[in-house]
Amino acid sequence: VQSALLEAMQERQVTIGKQTFRLPDPFLVMATQNPIESEGTYPLPEAQVDRFMFKVVIGYPSYHEEVTVVERMSAEIPEAATAVTAKELLGLQAVADAVYVDPKIREYAVTLTAATRRPQEFGLEGLRRYISYGASPRASLNMVLGGRALALLRGREYVMPEDVRDLAPEVLRHRLVLSYEALADDVTADSIVEQAVGAVQAPRIALGDPYEAQKTIPLAGEASQGA
C-alpha cells in the first residue's frame, strides 16, 4: 500500500501487475492527523511525508467562528455549490506556472532549506543537537511552487521574498526529523523553522528589469478559456 501511494503521489500513476494507469488531472492527496491521539495508527515513513507539499496546522476556531458553526448546524443545511471546475483549476495552475521567479528568490528558498541542515553555518549552533535530519530538496522546490501560487493570489505576476517566507513553516515543519533531545527539551519543528527564517536574510528585489520585462501573464478567465 505504501509503495502504491508513493507512486501515485510522485508519478501520478498506479501500477497493478503489468498494467499502469495514469491518474486524472487535477490530482492531489490530502491526509489528516490527530495531534492528540495516535493509538492504533502507524506513522508514515519520512519518504512519504516528504511528498506532501504542505503541513497545515489547524487549531481551535475563534469564538465568532465557533458561533457561526453552531448557527449553521441549527439551520437548514445549504446545498453545496461548485466553486471552480476541474478545467478552470487546470487553467489557474497554468497561470501560476507562468508567474516569474527571480534567481535570488530561488537561492533564498534553497538557503532556508540549508539552514535546517547546517544551522551552525547560520549562527544557530544551538540547534544542531535538536535536528537529526534537515529538510530535503523538495522543500526548496515546494517553497518556490507555493510562492508562485501565493503571489498570484496576492495579485502579482512575480514572486517576492515574503511569499516564500510566509510559506516556510507549512513547507518545512513536516520535513524535519527531530532528535530525542528536542523531544526531551520540548523543542518543536515550528520553533526551529522560526529561528531558521529569522537567521536567513531575505534578498532585496528591485522592481525593475527583469521584472518589468516579463510579459503579462493571462488572467484566470483567459487561461481557462484557452485550456
Regions found by a protein language model. Name each.
Residues 44, 65, 84, 100, ...:
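Alpha-helix N-cap and coil->helix boundary residues
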Residues 71-159:
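AAA+ P-loop NTPase domains with strong preference for DNA replication initiators
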Residues 121-227:
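C-terminal engagement/docking regions of AAA+ P-loop ATPases
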Residues 7, 54, 68-71, 110-114, ...:
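Generic alpha-helical structural context detector
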Residues 12, 73, 77, 116-120, ...:
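A general structural signal marking secondary-structure boundaries and capping sites
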Residues 4-99, 148-153:
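Canonical AAA+ ATPase core
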Residues 46, 86-88, 108, 113, ...:
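A broadly tuned preference for mixed-charge, low-complexity surface segments
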